């Protein structure tokens, strides 16, 4: 009898949960800079769709899991901050707890709507337009540092000093593998949050 009781107990157990490695209280955050070359001035009719999405997408970022900080002026966005020696370039500079948190915001939230329409609003850039790098927790990156990290990718390619979501590097001293970009680009949820 005891063996059939044991079999019943085993049959009623839930299936084991698969757990992906997660970094524990890391001393590093991920900084990201993304630049875009505007097709027209921000007040032009052809950019109305982009401008109308700024506030809701920024609010979504601010409330997203893993979000830490973003560059913004008193207006609440960074469109008025000049960088990269071109008045048509706008800069997005932010800090996230993990690469995964950043990737999920970019590819699995309503932010994807901006990506889908980027060709309507921005010129194609020949050079690097995205750079990621690890920073100690509590550090806020500067626009000058962001320009430097993009220059690193342009001049030397991706490395642990500056990399992309497509070719990420783990945090310094970490033995936790960096999740594949495919995990963010093709999430299991069918609708952006």
Where are these regions (language model features)?
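Serine residues within intrinsically disordered or low-complexity segments
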Residues: 3-4
């Amino acid at each position: 009898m005891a063996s059939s009781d044991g079999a019943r107990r085993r049959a009623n157990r839930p299936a084991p949960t698969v757990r992906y490695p997660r970094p524990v209280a890391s001393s590093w955050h991920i900084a990201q800079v993304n630049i875009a070359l505007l097709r027209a001035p921000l007040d032009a009719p052809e950019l109305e769709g982009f401008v109308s999405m700024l506030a809701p997408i920024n609010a979504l970022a601010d409330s997203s899991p893993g979000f830490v900080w973003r560059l913004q002026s008193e207006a609440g966005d960074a469109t008025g901050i000049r960088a990269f020696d071109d008045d048509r370039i706008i800069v997005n500079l932010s800090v996230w707890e993990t690469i995964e948190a950043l990737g999920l915001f970019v590819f699995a939230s309503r932010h994807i709507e901006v990506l889908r329409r980027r060709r309507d609003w921005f010129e194609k850039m020949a050079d690097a337009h995205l750079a990621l790098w690890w920073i100690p927790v509590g550090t806020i990156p500067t626009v000058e540092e962001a320009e430097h990290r993009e220059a690193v990718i342009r001049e030397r390619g991706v490395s642990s000093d500056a990399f992309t979501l497509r070719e990420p590097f783990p945090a310094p001293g970490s033995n936790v593998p960096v999740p594949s970009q495919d995990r963010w680009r093709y999430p299991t949820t069918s609708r952006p949050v």
